[in-house]
């Protein structure tokens, strides 16, 4: 079960992914050889989770704030109540939600931004390839990406990145990323090698999702016009 956990602090109950959305103004495309930076964070859009259950809900709320470029006033508890019946967790044990419920909430509440779009979970076998995928989707869609951290116990939002070139112009080297965490830093820069994304090691969902997520790098990603309705597992070589 995804649950918000802070190191050196008593374990917080419940599964709660936390996305912190980082918003900014999307830059105009530049020359392929020019270093590229994009960050969607803005301070008024950030939300801190209201309790141990609501990091996925807080993440959803702030993600949508960053997309809308304003505080939408979404209720974290309303979001959580939407997520839980639609996620893959054991209902007798869960208190928060998981990547499936989180992605469904982002898609359902998208209309509050004034438009419609789809988020889906993705499970990658390579951390660096996963982060490059996240950076490219931020550049292509102008929307943040959710990262599952603490081995499936928490989640944050990747709001931006720095790279050797614009991902829309071809292959690139990812150098830095910007993260918003609903229970920690509202906006923090990490090296690509030092990102908080790590392997999902929880076994509290249905067998199908346990198999899909376990041992992989799991993200909640804004999709293009043809999303995979059941998510996707990507083998990165």
Describe each model-derived feature in a short phrase.
Residues 2-99, 198-237:
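Active-site-adjacent structural segments surrounding the nucleophilic cysteine of cysteine proteases
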Residues 82-236:
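Conserved active-site-adjacent core of cysteine acyl-enzyme catalytic domains
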